[in-house]
Every structure is written in C-alpha cells, then in structure tokens.
Regions:
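Short, surface-exposed "cap/lid" segments of acyl-processing enzymes
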Residues: 227-241, 248-318
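Generic recognition of stable, solvent-exposed alpha-helical segments in well-folded globular domains
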Residues: 150, 257, 279, 288-289, ...
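Alpha/beta-hydrolase fold nucleophile elbow
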Residues: 341-357
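Alpha/beta-hydrolase-fold enzymes
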Residues: 167-202, 343, 347-348, 365-470
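Amphipathic alpha-helical
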Residues: 226-237, 459, 463, 467-472, ...
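Flexible loop/turn segments at secondary-structure boundaries
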Residues: 270-271, 284-288, 317-322, 357-363, ...
Length: 477
C-alpha cells in the first residue's frame, strides 16, 4: 500500500512521550490517514484489490444503537419527562448537586494549576479501583489526560446523584433512567475516543494511524459476519474447535429428537455410583459450558470421580420450531432425557444439575411433575446461577414492557424464532463497559485482535429461541 506525503513525527523519547507531540506533523498524519480510511470505505484498500460487491449495508447509524438498547422510544421519553418533572418539583435537588459539581470543578482547576507548578496535590476524584478504563499510567501522570479523566468522573457523579437522590412517583421510571444514564455515561467516556485516550493516541502516532486502518477492517469483518446486529468480536473464534480444544471429554450421542440431543460420557473408572447425573444447560447457549476444556470441565471431573454423566444439548431452533413452548421443552426435553438416562444406566432415579435458564426449566419440570400423575424419577436437583423468582430480575427488566414484547413478537412472526445474537447483544449492554466499549477500544481504535478466551467463545456461541417459547417466557415469567 502506497502512502503519500508520509512524514516523520519528532520523537525525542523512545516511549513516545505524549507531552512532546509534534502537532503540525500529527495534523498532516491524520489528514493522510483519513484519505486511506476513505479508500477503505469505498472498497479500494489497495490498487491491487478490487472493491468487493456486497448487499450488506455497511453504514452504522446512531439509531441502530438506540434501537438496540430500547426499541420503544416512548420508554425513554417517559423517563426523561418523569425526570424533568422531578427537577421542576424539587429545584433544591438540582441546585444542591450542581453546586457540588461547580465546587469540584473549581477544585479541579486549582489542582490543574498546582500540578502545572510542580506542587504536590491530591486528585479531586479517583476512579473505582475496578475501573480498567483509566488503568494506564498516562491517565495520572499526564496532566492533560488527568484533567479530562477527573472532569468526566465529576460530571458523571453529578448525573448519577441527580437520578439516585431523586424521588420518582413511579419507582420503575427511576430504574429506567438509571439504566439509560449508565449507557450514556459509558458511551461518552474519554477512553472511547482517539484524542482523549493516551494509549490510543500514542499508538496512532507510533504506527502512523495504521491501528485505525486495522480497526476499521476489524469492524468491517464483524459487520459482514453479523449484519445489522452491531456485533463485536470478543475473542479469536478461529483459535477454538469443538472436540479439539473445546468440549474434549469423550462421549457419544445416545438419543435425539427435535428438541435436544443426549450425550453419555465414557466412564474412566471400573465402578460408578448407582444413580447417574443428568446435566441441563441453558437453552440460550451451547452445552459445552460444562466441558470448556480439560482444565475447566465439570464433566471431566465427574467421570473421573465415578459419576455416570449425561448432558443435554439443545438443538438450535429454526422456523420449523416456532410452535415449541415450555410444555414441549418439559415433556419432550427434560422428562424425556430423564427417561433415557434411567434406561441407559439401569437406575430408577436420576440426579439433576442445572445451569442458568436450564435451572428455571428444571424448576418448572419439578412443579409439573408434582401436579401431574407422571412418574417422578428425580432423586435430587442442583441449581447453578438459576433464576426462579422473577419478581425482581435486575436490569433485564429494562427490556421488558408491553411495547418491547409486542415488538419482539412482530419480529418472531416473520421467521418463527428470536435470533440469539440479539439476545447476546442485550446481555452485553447490561455491562456496557466490560462487554462492549472495552472491545470497541481494543478492536476498533487500538486495532488489536481480541485475545483467545474460551469462555467468551462459548458466550458468543448463542442459540435461537422458538417463537412460542420466548413469547411465553416474556409474558408468563
């Protein structure tokens, strides 16, 4: 790739000290790389590469993120109106908090002047020790970035306090607004922008902007992989292969129907306990969370310790599965797996272990068996991270409303299922800093490849949900 007007930036320090940036050269460099970026956008990354035709829409617009967070605009406007009404009814609340904010800004300016004069002063505010966005030394040692960081933290504290200390007529409105404020706060973090993140700026200078070119290519690949899902890679998918370095415990499929497949694992011992163990994983992810690798495998531990282990693997629903509901997943899923495990092992009873929504399904199965004349072959039941009481299920309730559910049902009517990638995106925005913006910075701005992480490989290997099942889940639970 040829570069025009390439200039060397003055750099008196091998560590690319940001305090000594040649801003004239930097301006020329970014103008040059903007032209390169536009070449990529237009499909001409190099003279030897012909633009590739694609029916996929490449442009990402702000409304895509907006609709992903909340497909019903009424919800946000209701929250804004409720918050605005609260401020007008209680001007003392805004006055007190804005007064504190102004005091902190004055202190921050004094801090800035004192530090510039080589005086030793303590920062006005520090990030949470668990906040990795500002872990780089430059955020504290470089006065410019230190000021930006503290100004951001002071301002976000103001916003959070206004919401937290406000008394809303409807408590749900407060929770909604807290959620939306969190999304805005994380999105506007100075760590998410080239010129306000010291690590990105240093790398851009050092590499002549090539990190941004690689970052755009990473974005393009993500968008081609999952168009219109605003998907971002969290791990190197090519580094993992089922049966090779993921899900390596030996076993075989002994039963299958249109709901699930049942895996029976090979015994490593001469003798086994009489009662087998049947594992029920969540039906929104793949089965191998219980068998990630040899060092992180519950299944391997079980078979090595004389447990006769069975594991359900839910089939990935398609349009033909639209009418499958909880009754099918109970009768043709869990109950059928219990029967097969008992028959295969010769035991009249089976122990059950469940994870996440697999535990929710197990609790429903147990209630179903208690209220029917069906034979109950459950000896014991264990639940890992399973939600049973849905009275308060945290930030997930931000996505649950009549408008939201109706919108989802309209989408499902067209295809017969809910796309698991949409559900995965929802979970990412429950922890936007760790599961979304962290990867925007690493993949798109620093131009790095994501690291190899087997658990994130599993987390991104999502499955679809049948139309009836998901609709019943949203409305009934």
């Amino acid at each position: 790739m040829k570069k025009k007007n390439k200039k060397k930036l003055s750099n008196s320090s091998p560590k690319n000290n940001i305090n000594q940036v040649d801003f004239k050269g930097l301006n020329d460099l970014f103008e040059n790389n903007l032209n390169l970026y536009n070449s990529f956008v237009n499909g001409a990354a190099s003279k030897n590469e012909k633009p590739k035709k694609s029916s996929v829409k490449q442009d990402f617009k702000p409304k895509d993120l907006y609709e992903l967070i909340s497909p019903t605009t009424d919800r946000i406007f209701e929250s804004l109106n409720a918050f605005n009404a609260k401020i007008h009814k209680d001007p003392k609340l805004s006055f007190e908090n804005v007064h504190i904010w102004l005091e902190d800004i004055v202190k921050l300016n004094y801090y800035f002047i004192s530090k510039a004069s080589n005086k030793k002063v303590d920062p006005i505010i520090k990030p949470n020790i668990a906040d990795q966005r500002f872990s780089s030394n430059e955020w504290s040692e470089n006065l410019f970035f230190d000021f930006i960081k503290q100004f951001y933290l002071i301002t976000t504290t103001l916003l959070e306090n206004l919401v937290e200390k406000g008394v809303f007529e409807d408590p749900k409105q407060k929770e909604y607004f807290k959620f939306y404020i969190k999304q805005v706060i994380m999105a506007l973090s100075p760590s998410n922008f080239v010129f306000t993140n010291p690590d990105i700026l240093a790398k851009t200078i050092q590499e002549g902007g090539q990190n941004l070119i690689r970052g755009y290519e990473n974005y393009r690949k993500d968008n081609l992989k999952h168009p219109n899902k605003f998907y971002i890679s969290q791990t190197k998918f090519d580094d993992f292969e089922i049966g090779k370095n993921i899900a390596t415990t030996k076993g075989k499929i002994i039963y299958k129907n249109n709901i699930f497949e049942l895996i029976h694992y090979n015994s490593d011992t001469e003798k086994q306990f009489e009662i087998p163990l049947l594992i029920i994983p969540p039906f929104i992810n793949r089965y191998y969370i219980m068998d990630i690798n040899e060092k992180k495998s519950l299944v391997k531990f079980l078979v090595e310790n004389k447990i006769n282990a069975f594991l359900m693997s839910w089939k990935n629903p398609n349009s033909d599965s639209r009418d499958h509901g909880f009754k099918d997943y109970i009768e043709d899923g869990v109950m059928e797996a219990i029967k097969v495990a008992c028959k295969q092992s010769g035991s009249p009873k089976v122990n059950l272990a469940s994870y996440c929504i697999g535990g929710t399904l197990l609790s429903m199965t147990m209630a179903y068996l208690k209220n029917t004349k069906e034979k109950n072959s459950i000896n014991s039941a264990t639940f890992f991270a399973s939600l049973v009481n849905f009275e308060n299920f945290g930030d997930l309730q931000m996505f649950i409303s009549e408008e939201q559910i109706s919108s989802i049902e309209q989408v499902m009517k067209k295809v017969g299922y809910f796309d698991g990638r949409n559900l995965a995106a929802t979970f990412n925005f429950l922890r936007p800093g760790d599961l979304y913006w962290n990867y925007v910075v690493n993949n798109y701005l620093l131009g790095n490849e994501p690291s190899s992480f087997d658990v994130l490989y599993w987390n991104n290997d999502s499955t679809n949900l049948p139309e009836k099942l998901y609709s019943d889940y949203l409305r009934s639970l």
